[in-house]
Amino acid sequence: MHLCALLIAAAGVLASVRANYVEIDAYTVKPFAQQKPSTDSERSALKYKPHLHVQAGCHPYPAVQRDGSLSAGFEWKEKNSQPCGRSPLGSQVYSRSNWYKEKWAIMYAWYFPKASNHIGRGVSGSRHYWLYAIVWTDDANPTNSSLLGVTLSAGIGLSKHTKLKSKHVIDGTTLKLKSHLSFWGRRLALKFTNKLGETQDLITWEQLPPEAQTALTLDYKLNTPLQDFRFEDLLKEAYPF
């Protein structure tokens, strides 16, 4: 009986917390300014921050702001698949890092307020969409680390790479990526490119305030790859060695 009461109380708290988070217009979400790194993890995340060239779909937008308010995204319309342009307040790239099987893994994640998400017949899309790249290195200390491999969001599943071409990497650290519509699934995905894209202000998971972390974790519609259970599972799935 005591356990049952605790579970009911916890469910009530969760529902209350979830109800307190506000969705706001995607154009009004304020990105976080890139902070001066203070740990090896943060310095490594900056060292390997990729360039992103937008070939298809929206530019990346911020997903959450300091007070925990979340992007409401954009409505997907089948007959209106043109790009939704840039956020007037600036863009964002998120990161989270950890060790996995003696490799230092850095996930970079971009949020899109709408995207093509077609599998099967017809055309379909999502109001919220994430793309991510996981950079695998041999050390959390950026002074001693080197790039070992990369795992990318693909149209279906993940694409894993341990042999990188020099034309896709700047100075051995900075990946050149692009967003595109995949052949399989016709979904927004990532792949390597020769073109030099843009960078966005980086905010790491640890640098996010508690309100923003909690909002991203509890909002099931956003389904961010950075939240605890997804991040850990994705590292296992993405391991390329």
UniProtKB/Swiss-Prot annotation:
Residues 1-19 form the signal peptide. It comes from the Eukaryota. InterPro entries: NPP1 (IPR008701). Transmembrane segments: none annotated. It is found in: Secreted. Keywords: Glycoprotein, Secreted, Signal, Virulence. GO terms for cellular component: extracellular region. The keyword Ribosomal protein does not apply. A motif (Conserved undecapeptide motif) lies at residues 105-115. It holds the Pfam family NPP1. A motif (Conserved heptapeptide motif) lies at residues 125-131. Glycans are attached at N144. Induction: Expressed strongly at the early stages of host infection (up to 24 hours after infection) but subsided quickly afterward. Belongs to the Necrosis inducing protein (NPP1) family. Secreted effector that acts as a pathogen-associated molecular pattern (PAMP) recognized by the plant immune system. Induces necrosis in Nicotiana benthamiana leaves and can induce Phytophthora capsici resistance in Nicotiana benthamiana. Also significantly improves disease resistance of Arabidopsis thaliana to Hyaloperonospora arabidopsidis. causes an inhibition of plant growth which is typically associated with enhanced immunity when over-expressed in Arabidopsis. PANTHER family: DOMAIN PROTEIN, PUTATIVE (AFU_ORTHOLOGUE AFUA_5G00600)-RELATED. The structure of NLP effectors is remarkably conserved with a high level of conservation of a central region containing the conserved undecapeptide motif AIMYAWYFPKD and heptapeptide motif GHRHDWE. This is NLP effector protein 7.
